[in-house]
């Protein structure tokens, strides 16, 4: 009963209110106006989630190969980004990127009037995403690697399976479910990430989260309901998949 009340107050009633706003203020151009932000959210979410997963996988493998105290400390430092507010992280990344841009402008043959090479590109946004959500992917992948017995790795090394071949033929098949979970979790977080996206995005490059922020800042809560529902549906995807997987197992 208590859990039902919490679910009702925290999820069901807000979703019903969003649906009421969408129906009451529906306009013909609402969906078409959201197509580009929705596409941007999907693209940056998928690309960012895959990049975060790849970096996390390499870090976990490196940690398993080097069990020294230095490697452990370095691993923990690289996963601190999740504890840092997105706006603070965006500013922290923007400062060295701006300095690097100034150096590049001095040495690269750029046209007059060019004020940035890296700033305002998706590269900066993706770099910030990797730092921010690396811990989320690492925790999921580390859980999967606990099922990889050291004897399997030793046998592969004896058979001269090393480097990229070891990752492709041993690690990935054994932890592919954990890799999928990592991608899904990061994807959902990227879909609703706003501060980093707002501060590092290219000009006029909106996502659903940025569009919601713009509507709410102007007090247009009804217009923000439709993109909010889309993000909620995206967040329900991993919940449904995890529940199906748990029922199967």
Positions of the model-derived regions?
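Cytoplasmic-entry segments and transmembrane alpha-helices of multi-pass inner-membrane transporters
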Residues: 1, 58-97, 153
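Transmembrane alpha-helices
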Residues: 2-8, 80, 84, 131, ...
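A structural signal for multi-pass alpha-helical bundles of membrane permease subunits
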Residues: 13-18, 90-103, 128-131, 140, ...
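Periplasmic/extracellular loop-to-transmembrane helix junction in inner-membrane transport proteins
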Residues: 13-54, 66-67, 71, 114-115, ...
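Interhelical loop and adjacent transmembrane-helix boundary motif
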Residues: 18-32, 191, 197-240, 247-248
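Membrane-interfacial helix termini and adjacent extracytoplasmic/periplasmic loops
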Residues: 24, 31-35, 70, 90-130, ...
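C-terminal transmembrane helix and the adjacent membrane-cytosol boundary/short C-terminal tail
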Residues: 59-70, 142-153, 157, 164-168, ...
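Membrane-cytosol interface at the C-terminal ends of specific transmembrane alpha-helices
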Residues: 115-157, 183
